Amino acid sequence: WTSAQKDKVTREIIMGMNWWASLAPDAQNLSFALYSFSDPSVGRTSYEPIKRPQSDEGLWINEIMTNLGYTSGSYFAKVDSLNNWLKSEANADEAFTIFVVNDYNDADNKFADGYFAYAYLGGPFMVMTYDNDGYGIANMDAVFAHETGHIFHAYDEYASSGCECTESYNGCQNQNCENGCVDDVCCI
């Protein structure tokens, strides 16, 4: 990672956070705090994430979490522990972790199985590549915003995802699915 790359990633993530904050109703106080662990020893792993499939994430995420001092449980449990610490530090309601993988020297800017950005519904983390499959670093804010939606239980909206209009979380249906929803809500 160069300093310029790290700075650009930080700026793009902040722009994505600001986009979400700008959508909050006036009565809501939505803000984000960004903590960065950019010490090279923390992010060092014996695996090259970009050369592996997404399904191998546990190998390198586990090492990174151990480097951060989280040594107990699965890699998901370790990330949950970090997120709980982040919530406490920021006095926040929620926290999630972002892993950004440097794909600068990778020809297709994707993991071995074609993934380039993903998050788990409800968290605890998302993974993005630097170039985001041709969206480019200049559009990382949009990719981040999309994946953040998944962290907070938003489903995919594009037709090829297999989304359904009746998918719901907390009783709110996925009306931005491109597969013929009644309300046809806009999506990112």
Predicted regions and their residues:
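The catalytic-center signature of Zn2+-dependent metalloproteases
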Residues: L121-I188
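Active-site-proximal beta-strand/loop segments in catalytic clefts of secreted hydrolases
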Residues: W1, F99-N105, Y130-N132, A154
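Extracytoplasmic
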Residues: N91-A95, G123
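Short secondary-structure capping micro-motifs at structural edges
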Residues: L82-K87, A112-F116, I137
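A general structural signal for short secondary-structure junctions and capping/turn motifs
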Residues: K87-A90, A117-Y118, E178-C181
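Propeptide-to-catalytic entry region of secreted or membrane-anchored zinc metalloproteases
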Residues: W1-A92, D131
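Catalytic zinc-binding patch centered on the HExxH motif and its immediate surroundings
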Residues: Y104-P124
